[in-house]
Design a protein with these regions (language model features):
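Helicase motor core with emphasis on the C-terminal RecA-like subdomain
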Residues: 2-11, 15-19, 23-45, 52-55, ...
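Short acidic, hydrophobic short linear motifs in intrinsically disordered regions
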Residues: 360-362
Length: 362
């Protein structure tokens, strides 16, 4: 079996591992089921890509979004990894299945709804599986900020192939969510690797709202380079994008109300740009591979501390200085308290704690 460091240097061109990457990789290669909670920008994908290249068989990567899978596929293929996606929009599914069964894939990306189906289990019986990597693993927990019920259906697949190590990965999970991920995915409590959350290159700031458009425009003017501005509504996103266009910077909008082709074009333009501002709802950002984002602004309160950490963590992934600025108003907290009334009774206590954390001056 090739040494992980040799793979890192020859395939990826990095001189050495960062943070807890090697700890995670060595556990996975020893067959230990693991949950890795690592900061945004810490290189979580290497934690399954390196074992996938070292171990016999194919690594199955469960990922929540088709766009995210296709971004990861392009990045993997760019360094020569044999990878494929198996999604509803792929027209080459028969070819991908043939590549899997003939042992010609290092990585196979699938959505949780496909991975949990009986047909997929039968496919995996036809060739060796090296590893299950469950990306964005907080989606398995009702306590997480982005719960996806399909993630709850993965356990039978994992248990069917109980001899195959499983690696769950997330950047955002509080203690309650971590415990739930471990329980839902059958990972022992001593399988947790918790890296630090500090992002020292990001300068965090908060300001009371007093004319949001001007405040954000001033931030844009003061901060060269690409940036993301999170807005709480679709209409607000379009309105702010129009207003910021007057700054002279290229500005695009991104929200679920736009035509999918427009969303995709705007995302591609942002990823390729050196100075674009993206005004977006929280629909934008998961898996965006853009290391040079120089600022992330919030024109209102995010829905939780975890969501705030994940969204601001899209800034400065290249390690250079970046800014995260939150513009808040008392009405944000009023709306958040109103939303508590829509939460299931067994989750109200936890959501109150989250809201209190957002309101805390520390």
């Amino acid at each position: 079996v090739p040494h992980p460091l040799a793979i890192l240097q020859t395939v990826f061109g990095f001189p050495g591992f960062r943070g807890r990457q090697l700890d995670v990789i060595e556990r996975v290669m020893a067959g230990v089921n693991t949950l890795a909670v690592m900061p945004t920008g810490a290189g979580k994908s290497l934690c399954y890509q390196v074992p996938a290249l070292a171990l016999p068989g194919t690594c199955i990567v469960v990922s929540p979004l088709i766009a995210l899978m296709h971004d990861q596929l392009r990045a993997a293929e760019a360094v020569g990894i044999r990878a494929a996606t198996l999604t509803s929009v792929d027209t080459n599914r028969a070819e991908t299945i043939e590549r899997y069964t003939s042992g010609a894939l290092d990585l196979l990306y699938v959505a949780p709804e496909r991975a949990s189906g009986s047909g997929f289990r039968e496919l995996l019986d036809r060739a060796p599986v090296a590893l299950f990597a469950i990306d964005e693993a907080h989606c398995v927990s009702e306590w997480g900020h982005d719960f996806r019920p399909d993630y709850r259906l993965l356990r039978p697949l994992l248990d069917r192939f109980g001899h195959v190590p499983r690696l769950a990965l997330t950047a955002t999970a509080d203690a309650h969510t971590r415990a739930d991920i471990l329980a839902q995915l059958g990972i022992p409590h001593d399988g947790l690797i918790l890296a630090g959350f500090d992002r020292p290159n990001i300068r965090y700031a908060m300001s009371p709202r007093s004319g949001t458009t001007k405040q954000v425009a001033d931030l844009v003017a003061a901060t060269p380079g690409p940036g993301i501005v999170y807005v709480q509504s679709r209409a607000g996103t379009d309105k702010l994008a129009d207003a910021l266009s007057a700054t002279g910077r290229p500005v695009r909008a991104y929200h679920a109300g736009l035509d999918p082709a427009v969303r995709a074009a705007n995302q591609s333009a942002f990823v390729a740009s050196e100075d674009m501002v993206m005004c977006a709802t929280i629909a934008f950002g998961m898996g965006i591979d853009k290391p040079d984002v120089r600022f992330v602004a919030h024109a209102g309160l995010p829905k939780s501390i975890e969501a705030y950490y994940q969204e601001t963590g899209r800034a400065g992934r290249d390690g250079d200085p970046a800014v995260a600025h939150l513009f808040w108003g008392a009405d944000d907290f009023a709306r958040a308290r109103q939303r508590l009334g829509e939460v299931a009774e067994d989750r109200i206590a936890g959501e109150r704690v989250r809201l209190a954390a957002l309101a805390s001056p520390g």
